[in-house]
Amino acid sequence: MAERNMDMNKCPMPVQDPDVRNKNFDEVALGYTYDMAVNEARRCLNCKNKPCVSACPVQINIPAFIERVANEDIEGAFAILSESTSLPAVCGRVCPQENQCEGKCVRGIKGEPVGIGRLERFVADYHREHCTDAPVKPEPNGHKVAVIGAGPSGLTVAGDLAKLGYKVTIFEALHLAGGVLVYGIPEFRLPKQKVVAKEIEKVKELGVKFETNVVIGKSTTIDQLMEEEGFEAVFIGSGAGLPMFMGIPGEQANGVFSANEYL
């Protein structure tokens, strides 16, 4: 068992120098090095009650994956993450950990919580850069499910179902999969090719089929999917893609953009 690191504060995240990043749109946060990740992981107390797990929307076994990092078993950590999430590199970057897992971390009572999101990101990035093995496809269970929308919820459902042996097809209205991950989060926060595209590729490797430029209700209907194409269930994850307006004068003037358009 690795020796605990009782530092009160997180290991700082390396970032682009301001004089460099003000001239590009590359990712600002650069991620932990191997040694930084191991050192930060050793701050985890592996609490008996695991409040961080209860606060995680997908119930990742956080202490277990962090313990693997602390013991320098990065692929073991990735295997634990993969049991609960198909998008660890995305979630490690953009999930609001401060309100979820890290918000409940015992280390945060006196000092800073463990950098759970940073460690999740490190594990996912390390696996992507060092492991070339495709995910193991489970045995098909003979059931067929349609997923409407290739945003984070659709990708998550598709990945989870594929791991259980379901034959899954995602129908996406736009020409690229990813939803808000592609169209709503800036490149400097979430790189599209380096991260999002690679996460989607992993979902495809599980056997999930993607059909883009398909508008449900126009190109086809839910009834047709179930009655004519043999889908036994449909998950609707169409997202909240339309911007909200305040209804004030000048909103439609030239040069006025919604938040969606701006991002």
Predicted features by range, described:
Residues M1-K144, I236-L263:
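Ferredoxin-type iron-sulfur electron-transfer modules and their immediate structural context
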Residues G159-D160, V182-Y183, M246-G250:
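Short amphipathic alpha-helical segments
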Residues G76, E139-P140, K144-I148, I200-I248:
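Feature captures the FAD/FMN-dependent oxidoreductase FAD-binding
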Residues S86, G151-P152, L176:
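Residue-level detector of alpha-helix initiation sites
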Residues Y166-V182:
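Glycine-rich FAD pyrophosphate-binding loop
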Residues V114, G184-T212, E251-Y262:
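N-terminal glycine-rich dinucleotide-binding loop that anchors FAD/FMN and/or NAD(P) in oxidoreductases
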Residues H143-T169:
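N-terminal Rossmann-like FAD-binding beta1-loop-alpha1 element of flavoenzymes
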